[in-house]
Amino acid sequence: MTPRRQQRPKGQLAKAKQAKQPLARSRRPRRRRRAAITQNNLMMLSEPGLSFLKCAFASPDSNTDPGKGIPDNFEGKVLSQKNVYTETGVNFSGATTQNVDTYIIVLPTPGVAFWRCIKTATAPAQPAALTTTDVFTAVPFPDFTSLFGTTATNRADQVAAFRYASMNFGLYPTCNSTQYNGGISVWKGAVQMSTTQYPLDTTPESSQLVHAITGLESALKVGDENYSESFIDGVFTQSINGNAEFPFYPILEGVQTLPGQNVTVAQAGMPFSLDAGAATVAGFTGIGGMDAIFIKVTAAAGSVNTATIKTWACIEYRPNTNTALYKYAHDSPAEDIIALQQYRKVYKSLPVAVRAKLNANMWERVKRLLKAGLVAASYVPGPVGGIATGVQHIGDLIAELSF
């Protein structure tokens, strides 16, 4: 016989229910306290912080506002800019009998949109790999001379230092989908400036200060972490600051080529050279703390590969006090820890590159990452969790500032 389950007497059951009620009530004040977190605490993700994120990640198709600057612990006058370069009808194809490889490097060089080198070979041969004899030429932003002048020795007359928030590059095909033939590969790599005192074989003996860029060897081979697609898919990619801080870097003067005169590419330890061209058009103004973006576009003989190139950079300068630009400078925004944390989160979350058509939704993707990050932060104990709790208000703030 199956034993009967013992049942609690009705009186005891009622007492048990009554005993649970105070526990349920005790949770309510905590919920009320969470809901009552003031808007001031939530504003730790500030409007300048959101403007900084928008400048760094949003396409200038919608907004070219450079924001208020980078909201870190720097205190001083800054000049924020969002430089934009657009080139339409770019032909990546060669003659009907030529295979063409176009190399583009987006470097953190103020005033320069990107550096380009084109290599060709008569079909069926493929273009040779990059060597020390190859030269990358500068493609400047339209306002280069207004900020850096027309002589190499006066580059720092207006601004003394700079730092980047982001660099962005987009290639948008405009050719017929039945006529193209080729592909696009994108990868990234660390680059840095090196400066050495190089001895010269002269009488009497002398030396020369030589600038060079280390890390350009990454351009010689497609990196393991890469984006590779058909040319017709295009590409959008960006680089942001992965360093712990946002240091300023000096504007260089008197540099038009890397390496400089009297020093060979091999002696400087570079895989190829950079040439900014005429000083009245462009120049080499320095290297910031961002990873370089390497792009290789291939086109087969007889193909019709045309596209629009659009690149932009969110950058901050320290203007000289004796210039007219100084009156347009503003105080660097107060530190916004939440905005900087979300900037790092986006840095870790975004892929090397995406298809060009996905660029239109870039800011929407960033907003989703922001909301997800703030939701996760609301479960963190301490001040960060307290600030992030009530994420619905942050979402409303983001929505108000969205495009």
From Swiss-Prot:
Residues that bind Ca(2+) 1: D157
Classification via InterPro entries: Peptidase_A6, Viral_coat
One GO location term (cellular component): T=3 icosahedral viral capsid
Family matches, as Gene3D superfamilies: 2.60.120.20
Pfam families xref list: Peptidase_A6
Disulfide bonds, paired cysteine numbers: C55-C314
EC number per UniProt: 3.4.23.44
UniProt key word Hydrolase: yes
Residues reported in the UniProt entry to bind Ca(2+) 4: E217, G269
Record: active site: D61
Chain residue ranges for the region called Disordered: 1-32
Source organism superkingdom: Viruses
Family matches, as SUPFAM superfamilies: Positive stranded ssRNA viruses
Site (Cleavage): N359, A360
Protein name: Capsid protein alpha
Organism of derivation: Boolarra virus
